[in-house]
Regions:
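Transmembrane helix-loop-helix hairpins at membrane boundaries of multipass inner-membrane proteins
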Residues: 2-18, 27-115, 121-122, 473-476, ...
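Central hydrophobic cores of alpha-helical transmembrane segments in multi-pass inner-membrane proteins
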Residues: 16-34, 45-60, 76-80, 95-111, ...
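Alpha-helical multi-pass transmembrane bundles of energy-transducing inner-membrane proteins
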Residues: 34-41, 121-209, 220-223, 288-352
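Short helix-boundary/re-entrant hairpin motifs in multi-pass inner-membrane proteins
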Residues: 76, 213-272, 292, 299, ...
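Alpha-helical transmembrane segments
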Residues: 141-149, 178-179, 204-218, 273-280, ...
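Predominantly late transmembrane helices and immediately cytosolic-facing juxtamembrane segments
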Residues: 224, 325-351, 358, 381-428, ...
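Hydrophobic membrane-spanning alpha-helices of multi-pass integral membrane proteins
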Residues: 250-251, 352-364, 392-398, 418-436, ...
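Aromatic-capped, Gly/Pro-kinked transmembrane alpha-helices
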Residues: 441-447, 468-537
């Protein structure tokens, strides 16, 4: 199913890599043409098209190894390559996980009446289709373009749904950080070109500076360097498309890093990436375990899992590609499992609990890949501390997941039995897909990984028990201490400086408008004439 050991091939055979995205774009067109229909009809169409796309992607697993060139144009002075989608094992696994999340969101939409607008319903397949293209990006040119398009699309959506002016600085901060990462990717291409190498296909970029810039761009988008934890609170973007916007970007980054560093991180980058992984695992894990609202705490969940994945890759360089790929799968599937699981019946608690078991390293799951790497780290030279930090990160993530599973039960928002059944299928699908993908991954099962999983699981249970028994005042104190690590005050200060500069420029520019502009133009002309006269012989 996963074709984990199939070698990469970038031969331009057929356009298989574009098929899932094309299906999603067609879905958006169909939904737009049916925009005046009732919500039930729109839900049925979107769910049917999502299921069809999901099955098509599943069938494409036999074609792993092909690639698709999307253009004749190439910027030879910098990238010397065309737009390229690589349908390798990493890309297929990520695409399958992303489409599983998309299908789950489509199935559960009917259980959230009124929460999905027509614009959101149409944008969901468009955003997912562009995300698939970014996951399959085979070179730096494709990464730069797809990242920039996704950033712009996200910015437009967030600005359209926010009703709180205080949230705008956070949205612009997110756009600025992501834009800086795109510039860093362009810098990686420039460094590669200046060194005399023109090949920007991932896996074949050997320039140390270029590799370092690619890794740095990934860390920026993961929120590790510099730290930028979250988007502002957007009540209309908690679930649905909000889930996609928070889970897709880090998975895209991990797909790129897995493709570039499949054979291991360069020696020069290992200390830097280990430090970033430790920051993500510890800070992200602590903030996630202390999060009062799991939905608003998703950025810390992403930061913790991404940091833990980087630590695991540093422990076991021989499996870097598989580790980073499965880290992205965990972010998508486990993140979707708790993001969509509103507890309406006791049976619904099963899926968040199962997701917690997966994320702490259960065998035969993507989490087992990380647990196995950490188990090997305890026996390696100089890697025991990385394994220990990884165990702390997994335990903290599990603690936060258990807290979400025991959240209070709420009433059904809708009474139709079919909607309830489909909703149960939708929230359980990511967990079942994670189990199926883990069963096909050889690195997901090892004796050491099982032992590590038991230890991390016990630590997560103990952490949850301690959090439950801890007085509320102490929890608030812990959140207050942890929030001091939040760099948002610095970003707010930078925003105020930016606004002050704009206000100054506006004040200076106002006299140049209207009649004042004509007067100033006369003054400029007189000064020029005086200058010419003073230089005349």
């Amino acid at each position: 199913m996963l074709m984990a050991n199939r070698p990469h091939s970038f031969l331009p055979e057929v356009g298989l890599a574009t098929i899932p995205s094309v299906f999603l774009f067609v879905t958006a067109v169909i939904l737009w043409s049916l925009r005046r229909k009732r919500e039930a009809a729109l839900w049925a169409v979107s769910s049917a098209m999502a299921a069809l796309t999901w099955f098509v992607c599943l069938g494409l697993s036999t074609s792993v190894g092909s690639s698709t060139s999307l253009s004749v144009w190439r910027p030879e002075d910098l990238f010397d390559s065309r737009l390229l989608l690589a349908f390798d094992s990493t890309g297929w696994q990520m695409a399958y996980a992303a489409l599983t999340v998309y299908l789950s969101l489509a199935l559960t939409q009917a259980a959230r009446p009124g929460a999905t607008t027509m614009g959101t319903r149409i944008m969901l397949p468009v955003y997912t289709g562009l995300s698939l293209a970014a996951m399959l990006a085979g070179n730096l040119l494709t990464v730069a373009i797809t990242w920039a398009v996704l950033d712009l699309l996200t910015f437009i959506f967030l600005m359209s749904v926010t009703t709180d002016e205080t949230a705008i600085p956070g949205i612009i901060t997110r756009l600025a950080m992501d834009g800086f990462s795109v510039i860093t990717v362009v810098g990686a291409a420039a460094a590669n070109w200046s060194s005399g190498q023109t090949n920007t296909v991932f896996g074949e970029i050997s320039t140390p500076l270029s590799a370092g810039l690619i890794a740095t761009a990934g860390l920026i988008r993961l929120g590790m360097f510099p730290l930028h934890f979250s988007l502002p609170k957007l009540p209309r973007a908690r679930r649905g498309l909000g889930t996609m916007i928070r889970l897709m970007p880090p998975a895209i980054v991990l797909a790129v890093l897995a493709r570039q560093f499949e054979a291991g991180f360069p020696v020069e980058l290992i200390p830097w990436l280990n430090l970033a992984g430790a920051v993500g695992a510890v800070i992200g894990g602590l903030r996630w375990a202390l999060a009062e609202d799991p939905i608003q705490g998703r950025p810390f969940f992403v930061l913790a899992i991404a940091g833990t994945g980087l630590l695991a890759a540093g422990v076991d360089p021989t499996a870097t590609g598989a580790i980073l790929t499965n880290t992205g799968i965990l972010i998508l599937l486990v993140g979707a499992a708790f993001s969509m699981a509103e507890i309406h019946s006791p049976a619904h608690r099963l899926w968040p609990i199962a997701a917690a078991v997966i994320v702490v390293g259960a065998p035969f799951t993507p989490g087992g890949v990380l647990a196995g790497a950490f188990a090997r780290g305890f026996t390696g030279a100089g890697t025991a501390w990385l394994a220990l930090l990884g165990g702390v990160g997994l335990a903290a993530i599990g603690t936060g997941m258990i807290a979400g599973a025991v959240s209070p039960q709420s009433n059904w928002p809708i009474g139709e039995s079919m909607v309830r059944v489909v909703y149960g299928l939708g929230i359980g699908l990511p967990v079942l897909a994670a189990l199926g993908m883990g069963l096909q991954t050889p690195q997901a099962t090892s004796l050491g990984g099982v032992v590590f999983f038991i230890g991390a699981g016990v630590a997560a249970l103990f952490g949850r028990y301690a959090m439950h028994r801890l007085p509320y005042g102490y929890k608030e104190l812990g959140r207050g201490v942890a929030s001091r690590l939040d760099p948002d005050p610095l970003y707010r200060a930078a925003w105020r400086v930016y606004v002050s500069i704009l206000r100054f420029v506006r004040t200076v520019a106002e006299p140049l408008e209207g009649e004042g502009g004509m007067l100033w133009m006369l003054v400029v002309v007189i000064l020029v004439l005086l200058g010419i006269g003073s230089t005349a012989p």
